[in-house]
């Protein structure tokens, strides 16, 4: 089953990191990505440009409205994602806990709806209705 790991972090904290610390942080991402690939769990992953480059799109009353910046003003902003293959939610949470930004920000894990596998979707929705797990 596929899970999307949304990576939220404070851009200002990352930008303020000394170069050697930032290099080590990014090195952690490169190593993590290679571990996922080697385990056959990597589907996709990308970093996003800084939040000031975002544009929000809405249609209200049939009219297109765009706004510079993200949808919400929060300290942590969406900075990237991994799409991973995991047996179940518990395994996806274990994968998410290894993402470097789990130490500096927040990782949101969500099951991905696969329109080609309705039975898998039902199992994922049932699993998400259960109490939260600890990793």
Functional labels for PLM-detected ranges:
Residues 1-135:
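Conserved, structured core segments of small domains
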């Amino acid at each position: 089953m596929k899970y999307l790991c949304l990576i939220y972090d404070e851009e200002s904290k990352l930008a303020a990191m000394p170069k050697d610390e930032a290099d080590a942080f990014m090195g952690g991402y490169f190593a993590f990505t290679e571990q996922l690939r080697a385990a056959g769990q990597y589907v996709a992953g990308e970093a996003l440009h800084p939040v000031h480059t975002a544009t929000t799109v809405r249609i209200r009353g049939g009219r297109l409205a765009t706004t510079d910046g993200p949808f919400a003003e929060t300290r942590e902003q969406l900075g990237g994602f991994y799409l991973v293959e995991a047996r179940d939610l518990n395994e996806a949470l274990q994968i998410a806990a290894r993402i470097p930004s789990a130490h500096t920000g927040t990782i949101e894990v969500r099951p991905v709806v696969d329109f080609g596998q309705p039975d898998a979707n039902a199992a994922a929705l049932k699993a998400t209705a259960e109490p939260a797990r600890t990793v």
